[in-house]
Amino acid sequence: MKKDFITKQEQRQPLRQLYMWLKSLQSTLVFMQTGAHPDDETSRMLARLSLGDGMHVVYVNAVRGQGGQNALGPERGDALGYLRTEELFEAMRVIRADIAWLAESSDDPISDFGFSKSGEQTFEHWGREHSLRQMVKMVRLFKPDILIPTFLDVPGQHGHHRAVTQTTIAAFDEAADAKKFDDLELAAWQVNTLYLPAWGGGGGSYDDEVPPPDATHEIRTGAYDAVLGGTYAQIGEWSRACHATQGMGRQVDEEERPVPLHQLRTASGKAVPTGLTQDVPERLAALAAHCRDEKGREAAILAQKAADDALTAFPNGEAVLSALCHLQTALLALEKSVSPRHVHRVHLKMRQAGMAACEAAALQFHFEVSPAVPVVGQPAEASLSWHVADPANAPVISATMKGPEQITCGPFAGSGRGKRRQSMTASLDIAGPPIDAMTGWHGVMVSPTSLHAEVSVKIAKTEFVVPLCPDTVFSTMPVHTGQITPNRTLLRHGQDSDIDMQLQLEATLKPDEHAHLTLPKGWTFDLVAGDSDTKLQGRVTVPSSARQGHYRIGAKVIEQEVFSTQRLAYPHIRPQTRFAMASANIALVDTAGLNGVRIGWIDGGVDEAHHWADQLGAHIIQLDNNRLISGDFEGIDVIVAGVFAGGTRPLNRSMRHIRSWIESGGHFVSQYHRPIDNWDKTQSAPLRLQPGSPSIRWRVTDAVAPVRMLQPDHPLLNSPNRITNEDFDGWVKERGLYFASEWDPAYVPLLAMSDTDEAPLEGSLLAARIGAGSHVHCALNLFYQMDHMVVGAFRLFANLMTPSGRT
């Protein structure tokens, strides 16, 4: 496999990048779309507006995507949120768009807490006022002329989507009211036009109950751009493919795929029948009407001519640079004369002209920090380097660094003058608290809040200033880092009392420092071995008086928390490091074990429930495709089909063998599946069974929704553990999803539950007797509950995994 840096260097496309920046000089409009999750954006529309029309596109996203699935690897929760943050960064880079986040940091209440069915349910987590404040902030920062949410606020749509649409519509007025959220210290901004999508949000997941509004406008995406090598719809899919953890991106042909819009509101109160805006300067020349003197009006006309000349000169770099220098000169004159309401348009064009000039001059900037993730309190260095095509006529480069208040940036000192690759370095003093990789926005219109360099590039006596961020995601490391192992442990109450545990620190402690574990009350730690400067190794003893529950063990050096680190790296995104307080989580559960049970696992790569079966004492046998297709189940007591396993494993081909094995006395457990996971209601289960669609109608999103036992005396709810309503206490995120919507009469529904004001669903847990054996289909989100140490989930899981012919 090629090394990442070689691949990136090989795939550089400076001419394409130059072309994209030159296109951005053709419009002075700002277009903002809002969405809830990374991958909600209407990519082909944004590609057309940005790369076709030259509008400055800003996509405002609410959450980081912590609640999604991961098609690439094991990362879930917060780790997945970091991956999806980077995926959206890459997706927007493809279509040359800025990104802003309502959740500006990893601890923001606007989080991907799980599925919801209404805006009200969503705001219970996010906070309605906080959400609106954040949306108003982004509107005032980026000053869009056109604003549109991604989805409609209608029943049957995801509650996160509905909440974002509500705040987007409200922000149209609120952002223009200087008295609202004046603590932001941002000038009020009136959006010119507000649109809604004129398309429905139905499909396999959602079920809009109200049809979309009539289309008043249309964005056509079928035009082919010979330089970029695709239509805007195709480029949109290149962007969507960056959301690889969500399996996004599909092949589309060169055909027209229009995007219909519905004009909802305008600043004037009058409909705008043609064009997307009214009385807004759409090009540099149009700014002439907003200048206070003739010199400014002439500058606007000259700026427009220079922007046009630069695009016409492409790909002649020398001619492009000449035109860009004329453009920058005109923009400086225009800046002094244009109305304050429109000066941001001039500033944006200056930055975009600077980015274009850097590409035309083939500077190929690199901005690196060493070490890549500096430790708080330890020295670090920043290095800025660039390529010089002609050392005898090299641009004059200078730079200043800016960043959060925790960072003190030294001045840059240059080296390598006269060489093809020149550079400058500067010192960084890093204070606490640690800086997280998640930042509030990325792009060229608004200066980053994270570490960045403001780089001055002088070409032929014309100065351009561009913002540059480090090549890799910038964050800083806490002082003390390490790992506690094992980090997740299941103990059976009354059976297990000791845990062998180790704290491994990543750096040697100072002579006056010492590390210790922080234990629940009454728990003890006996040191067995280890160098106290780097490692503690010993045995944790749980007192007999400890009650069933979830317990946490942490670590400190003196009184400073120890943090664990996780490196996140995939080829399609920039690597990054996240950190969280080091911890070991223990579930102390009053449950029977699975000692001696041989479980054949059909792993779908989504859940790790087999880990918990192993901790309960079962012997796990991972069934490969050959064993499935041949029906080689000799010596296996239970077969489990993991979450979504049918999407990647030959479940349908092997079902006749599984059915025969069940009839001979085997116990089969299937976890929840989507209809898209190659599900066939007559072939994917031993008897007819169908997961419901659209999924919003067949899930219970309220994690504390009441659960009614339809068959309280059924063996599955009584052996080996007696399941009660207490076992459904403390659940997180949701009860379950993709509940069965229809099933063979042989199946017995065991539970009923629903979200508020909805009819009870009975397809969450089904059991059937088939010959001498049995099948249980479980659409409860058990694996997620166990991963979050919910004790009742372990008790029910043990019952599901026990082969006793109880159904």
Regions found by a protein language model. Name each.
Residues V346-H347, P478-I499, E506-L509, I573-A592, ...:
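Extracellular ligand-binding/catalytic regions of CAZymes and related secreted enzymes
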Residues K2-F181, Y195, G200-G201:
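Active-site beta-strand->loop->alpha-helix modules in alpha/beta enzyme cores, enriched
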Residues G54-M55, W189-N192, S664-H667, G773:
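A short helix->loop->beta-strand "cap" motif at the edges of active sites that frequently abuts
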Residues G647-D727:
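A glycine-rich, often tryptophan-bearing local segment used as a flexible ligand/cofactor-contacting loop or short
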Residues I696-M789:
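Catalytic beta-strand/loop cores that center a nucleophilic Ser/Cys/Thr
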Residues V562-A641, Y784, T802-G805:
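Aromatic-Pro/Gly-enriched surface loop or interdomain linker
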Residues V369-L588, G593-N595:
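Long beta-sheet-rich domains in secretory-pathway and surface-associated proteins
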Residues K2-E10, Q17, E174-Q364:
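The feature marks non-catalytic terminal segments
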